[in-house]
Regions:
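Basic, Lys/Arg-enriched alpha-helical interface segments
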Residues: 1-107, 119-138
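Histidine-centered metal-chelating micro-motifs
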Residues: 109-111
Length: 138
């Protein structure tokens, strides 16, 4: 036998909205996203060691602001900017950047992407030396 009475009150519209904490825009601390990672250059292609080194180095970078990170060397925790034309894979059509940021992970293998706000969007992670760009070019 079914009950005819409803229990409680239906939720109010404001109760259904998710509350997301606001992060100050000028905080300057690093965020990482794999939202735009490209096929053949993702985490699945990395060895266990490479994944570990990637996370360890990124965790160290998170202790700095973007400004502080810019003071580090490119083969340390810092980065360099490389022109779009230097990369072997073609960037997604929607991206119009002329240069991309390149960081290093395991044994100086690079990973590249772009920064929007405080978020770094990874496009490519190199797992074999020379797959992402010719390292002899400048």
């Amino acid at each position: 036998m079914a009950k005819g009475k409803r229990r409680g009150q239906p939720p109010k519209a404001t109760d259904q909205e998710l509350s997301v904490p606001k992060v100050p825009e000028d905080d300057g601390h690093l965020l990482l996203s794999f939202r735009h990672i490209q096929p053949r250059f993702g985490v699945d292609e990395m060895s266990e060691r490479q994944r570990s080194e990637f996370l360890i180095k990124w965790a160290k970078r998170c202790g700095f602001t973007w400004t502080e990170l810019g003071l580090h060397t490119k083969h340390g925790l810092g980065y360099e900017m490389l022109p779009r034309s230097q990369f072997k894979p073609t960037p997604p059509e929607a991206l119009t950047e002329d240069k991309y940021m390149v960081f290093r992970h395991d044994a100086n293998l690079p990973f590249a992407g772009f920064k929007a706000g405080d978020t770094f969007y990874v496009l490519w992670i190199e797992t074999r030396y020379g797959d992402l760009y010719d390292h002899g070019k400048k």
